[in-house]
């Protein structure tokens, strides 16, 4: 059974810094700072072209507060892999966001390039997930979409990070 301590929250809000190792072969990003992504969620600064000089990927932690949601979006030309550390998220996905999948702590999810998706946290627990994407610029490929009419009830859910 995976156990998660509350240390992740403290680390998420500490100042981020990159630490170069002697010899220059690896870079450690001390997590801490975060930013509001176009997709409407708070992302902890992680590995990217900006923080580590990454050329083909980014890796960060996303949080979705209880009773909130992201913004419908796609990542044009980039794959995403997501591991849910804690919480439970309803993900609407596919053309017109017509498909619904529930992702729980311990689940992995793969999102192919260009697939629309929208995370919703209907629970009373913070969702924390680790996200890897083949976009080293992090936000470069994010294209936001409108909420489709069949999901209009989600207008009542605040966007996690407006």
Where do the language-model regions lie?
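A short, N-terminal "cap"/entry segment at the start of jelly-roll beta-barrel domains
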Residues: 1-56, 71, 144-162
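Conserved short histidine dyad/triad with adjacent acidic residue
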Residues: 45, 60-76
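Short strand-connecting beta-turns/loops that link adjacent beta-strands
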Residues: 52, 77, 96, 124-125
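A short hydrophobic beta-strand segment most commonly corresponding to one strand
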Residues: 59-62, 81, 110, 124-143
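Residue-level recognition of conserved beta-strand positions in structured domain cores
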Residues: 61, 74, 93-95, 121, ...
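Conserved metal-binding segment of the jelly-roll/cupin
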Residues: 64-67, 103-123, 132-134
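A short beta-strand-loop-beta hairpin characteristic of the jelly-roll/cupin
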Residues: 69, 78-105
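Structural motif
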Residues: 88-90, 116, 126
């Amino acid at each position: 059974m995976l156990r998660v301590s509350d240390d992740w929250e403290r680390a998420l809000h500490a100042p981020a810094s990159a630490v170069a190792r002697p010899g220059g072969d690896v870079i450690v990003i001390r997590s801490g700072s975060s930013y509001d992504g176009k997709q409407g969620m708070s992302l902890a600064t992680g590995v990217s072209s900006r923080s580590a000089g990454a050329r083909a990927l980014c890796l960060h932690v996303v949080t979705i507060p209880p009773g909130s949601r992201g913004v419908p979006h796609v990542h044009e030309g980039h794959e995403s892999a997501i591991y849910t550390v804690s919480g439970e998220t309803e993900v609407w996905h596919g053309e017109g966001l017509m498909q619904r999948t529930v992702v729980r702590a311990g689940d992995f999810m793969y999102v192919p390039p260009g697939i629309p998706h929208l995370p919703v946290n209907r629970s009373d627990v913070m969702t924390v997930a680790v996200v890897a994407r083949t976009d080293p610029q992090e936000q470069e490929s994010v294209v936001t979409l409108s909420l489709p009419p069949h999901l209009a009830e989600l207008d009542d859910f605040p966007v996690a990070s407006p």
